Amino acid sequence: MTLSINPNIYGIPNCDMTQKALGWFKEKKIAVKFHDYKIEGITKQKLSDWSKKKSWEVLLNKRSTTWRSLSAAEQEKITNQAAAINLMMEQNSIIKRPVIEYGDQLIVGFNEEEYKKTFK
């Protein structure tokens, strides 16, 4: 399938949900650009932009191993967007994956139904 612009997929290659998303796009023959947090990092500006489209609570993966490995005191400090962004910059594996940018749209997490609606 040819789209006017290619989606950007942000994630970590060994993440199950990122792999699932990449597989979905490959199956649909949709070309994507993959951004590996571990190699390319993430900017504060990008996280701030994303937080305007989806709340920081959506972007911060509280079910992740990284979140669960934080002490209760560290977790309790994350009460606002600035604190969440700083944490996501320090430990980018705590960002919910994948994050997909497509034009002005932002999809967070693997959601096949949303993919079907967006990429038709």
Where are these predicted regions, by residue range?
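Short, flexible turn/loop "capping" segments at secondary-structure junctions
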Residues: M1-T2, N92
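Local sequence-structure signature of Cys/Sec-based thiol-disulfide redox active-site neighborhoods
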Residues: T2-K28, V32-Y37
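Thiol/selenol-based redox catalytic cores and closely related redox-interacting motifs
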Residues: Y37-K120
